[in-house]
């Protein structure tokens, strides 16, 4: 019989953090062992990650606990996708190895999943703390005033995409219905090369069922901890390459044409947008041209989507 929930942890060369996260999980999972399974995807770590995994497999011997070690590093998004593809449980919760999670969270998640058998997506509200300074910079990331089950998942999530796109990129906050997120991976197999693909997976699930966005915060995002934060081109790539591509893909799963077009074209709404583009052109001319040409293609596709249904655009997408 399949488990209700898989708790999956993608990790790479952070054995100490993984050990700390599994310490939290060992406490939280008590009493719920029969509902859960644990999966660790090691992205070809060179530290003692494997020793940590084996240690906890012995400690948590009463829980189904499996792991995978990639033969080579397949990237952050590739390793997350590995976690999403592996489970056979009804739901999958992929958590970062460095994100602090409250002890009450797992119990709340399991209770809610049992209460709402048709749930497509649960998104846990969260706070944000800067790793370097330790300062709490965001007290509550998403503007949700209740834990109400919403059957209009697409409409609800469209509002969050418009209001706070960055918030939906936090992998540890999303609990997916497994069959839906695995369909999303099949629909867009190259999504692992897009740093914003988390938003697509989440929006895809929301478009195919009911959702819950919690009012209370249940975990904390460790900000400034990713290697991507050290890349000076990261914001430019997100703005002109990765996020626009996500909206093009969302056209195909039924998100409104005008909404997607608006979000793709928003990079030309203010004078500062042109300054960003010109600044990037001066700093990284070849990279900027390489990114901007496909962006122009996204602009044209979004414009044509107003006139033609998405099915007629499939060959272009």
Ranges and model annotations:
Residues 263-317:
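Membrane-interface aromatic/basic loop that binds lipid-linked glycans or pyrophosphate carriers
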Residues 26, 57, 61, 114, ...:
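Short, flexible coil/linker elements and helix-boundary hinge sites characteristic
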Residues 124-126, 216-218, 255-270:
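Acidic carboxylate-rich catalytic motifs and surrounding loops in phosphoryl-/glycosyl-chemistry enzymes
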